[in-house]
């Protein structure tokens, strides 16, 4: 017998979708409006964030609280990529294996920070972590 999801659980699902939506719209704004071309790792992170926006929107519409089963793997992989990207940005990964500087745009520019302080890869990592935490909370509230 599954516990009956409360209105609070649906609000958490909505919040999860909003985090994914804001992340997706922000990435599109930076790339399309500001004209900043994403690096290779940014593209991979987008490949995991963009589908989350659609999946979580459908889950909200259908009140599908089992969404964690297929959204959490995307979130964990996206977070792992964002973590590696953050380490690259911080210079903690050696130069020879940095995919961002070999060809295409670099992650080391000043345009890769929010307000000149928080790097965009760290923001992506934060978004993936928030989504993962919310999905785990939803799972715990709806699974016996």
From Swiss-Prot:
Q: Which GO terms describe its biological process?
A: protein folding
Q: Which domain of life is it from?
A: Bacteria
Disulfide partners? 39-42, 100-107
Give compartment(s): Cell inner membrane
- Provide any one GO MF term from the record: protein-disulfide reductase activity
A single GO cellular-component term from the record reads: plasma membrane
List the InterPro entries: DiS_bond_form_DsbB/BdbC, Disulphide_bond_form_BdbC, DsbB-like_sf
The transmembrane residues are 10-29, 44-63, 70-87, 116-138
Query: According to its UniProt entry, what is the function of this protein?
Result: Required for disulfide bond formation in some proteins.
Protein name according to UniProt: Probable disulfide formation protein
Q: Which organism is it from?
A: Metapseudomonas resinovorans (Pseudomonas resinovorans)
